[in-house]
Curated annotation (Swiss-Prot):
Xref: InterPro entries: EFG1/Phd1/StuA (IPR029790), HTH_APSES_sf (IPR036887), KilA/APSES_HTH (IPR018004), Tscrpt_reg_HTH_APSES-type (IPR003163)
Full protein name: Cell pattern formation-associated protein stuA
Region annotation Nuclear localization domain: where it falls in the sequence: 585-613
Originating species: Leptosphaeria maculans (strain JN3 / isolate v23.1.3 / race Av1-4-5-6-7-8)
Region (Disordered), start-end ranges: 1-52, 246-645
Keyword Glycoprotein: no
Recorded family membership: Belongs to the EFG1/PHD1/stuA family.
Residue ranges with Polar residues bias: 254-271, 279-288, 336-365, 502-542, 569-584
Function recorded in the entry: Transcription factor that regulates asexual reproduction. Binds the StuA-response elements (StRE) with the consensus sequence 5'-(A/T)CGCG(T/A)N(A/C)-3' at the promoters of target genes. Regulates the expression of several effector genes (AvrLm1, AvrLm6 and AvrLm4-7) during infection stage.
Biased composition (Low complexity): 18-52, 317-330, 469-481
Amino acid sequence: MNQMQPYADVHQPHMSTAAHAPASGPPAGLSHYSYPHQPSMMQPQQQQHQYGGQPTGYPYAYNNGVPSQLPASSSMNNALVPSTLQLPAMSAGAPNSSMPGSQSYQSHTFDHTGQVAPPGMKPRVTATLWEDEGSLCFQVEAKGVCVARREDNHMINGTKLLNVAGMTRGRRDGILKSEKTRHVVKIGPMHLKGVWIPFERALEFANKEKITEQLYPLFVHDIGALLYHPSNQTRASVGGAAMAAVDRNRRPDSMQTQQRYMAGPTTSQAPSLHHHHSMTNSVGSAMSQPPHAIQPHPSSGRPSLDRAHTFPTPPTSASSMMGMGNQGSSYEWNGANVQQHPQGNQPLSIDTGLSNARSVPTTPASTPPGAVQQGIPYGSSQSYDGSRPMYSAPPAQPSQYAQGQPMMSYRPDNAYPKTEMAPPSRISDVPEEGEVKASDGMMPQGNEQVAAPPAGGEEENEYTHSSAPYNGNRGPYGYNPNGPPGPMHADHTHLSPEMTGSPHQNGSGRATPRTATNGQAQWGSSYPTPQRQAPPSSNLYNVMSDPRGAPNGNAAHDAYQGPGAVPQYASQGYAPTNGVNSSGKRGRDEEDAETYRPDSVQGDDMGGLKRRKTMEGGAVGQTYAQDPSPGLQRAHTLAAQRARR
């Protein structure tokens, strides 16, 4: 971590001492700078160190010992890691190579020997005993594929090798089948199955597919040294846990250096802080703040290191934690930075901190705002629901709504049957009830949705609601245009109390006869015109009435009873509008369903079952409208209503 600050210094001395660096691990990272001049000299030595019996040669960059290696490697990796981030530019300059500068150039040109570690690449080798073959197998993972190499004859699993290249199965198998020397393994662990080919052929394939560097150190001759070297054991052979721990230790540095490079390599001291922030910010808007944070943080870099250590790994997984913590920390640090460096950038850093905190903790921080915002919409939606309960709660009022708006909505319903069925004159008498269902079929969906609030058998209620608002709407509609609306309203009011007092069930069937006389007459006169008038307003009113009439789910039914309770159903001008005789089926349904319909309005089982059946049979509420002979149904309904009357 401390090296991070001297990191630039480290590079400079190493650059100056690069010629001497080969022996010292740190110089290797910098060796790329000076080595370009002496690539040939350094390469043999470093290779010896790397791959020679001296494992230190390879860890060459890690000579300082594992703990120090991490910083050293981190500094090198920092050079390397940033290079990985900015690999195009960084790699273009040898800096990427932690190994000899000459090799770095070779690696950039592409190493065909497999002996040179690509820039920033660490040897990661594991070994397992292949009991069936009686040999150790060295395993290197690349692109999620484990490629194995035998220790005794150094053959390599060509199948897995070509899988790393992303080769198709057919092409891979064709190439492997053409190999003269091959060993097919069909039994054993998955990573050992496949066609094994000689080391030289495997290297040729790797070079041809340009995956040699990705497979490093699979082709290193003394791969065992990499495996068994203590530093490498802790880093590579030990496994993911060790690597994860090492990464955690290195991450503050490497991440800091990376972001430092990205943000601005000028302040090597700051990395800790803005890494801390930049990492957290990286979650939200990583790059935006680091530049600002870098300058302010340099002075406060150390303190931030602690936080950086605590935060660096979490940010991604604990973005919410990071966001919250970072918000606080970013604010604090920004404030501190402001005090320390009241530069123009610091306010930016503060702002960025805020914005980053916002963006970073999007989950925690923004969720409350999101929740609030959503709460507002939810509130509105709830209020909408509230409107539904209101409709359902005060059925009498719903009847009023039905009287007023249902008339409007009724128009559209009537308009549909009217246009379809025809004689508007008769519409006034019976059709309404038949049509209510038809309209239910037509309109109910919207109403149902609106009316959905009534909990009991939403389908039924909704369906009923749709019919009810339609009935109510239709009835009041006719009344409104005729001016009978007054009497209708009176009837409606009477009906609505009666209906509400009596079963909300509807005045649809039963109430219709009771109040139908007035309403029917009114319907007869007014219904045709209102129906025609209704369509334009019906859509609007349906929207309106859906909440009012449909939401009335219960109230809507009351409203049906109230405004059109008897008159609507009796007059349910659907049959007249649709056709005089449309009531036939409807009448039957009404007879059977009048009880049913009130029930359905109430969400009773019979109504619910019937409506459910209709819903199952076809679109919700459209079942009536969908009936092949809506006119007949309405006629039946009219006949039944008339008979009852």
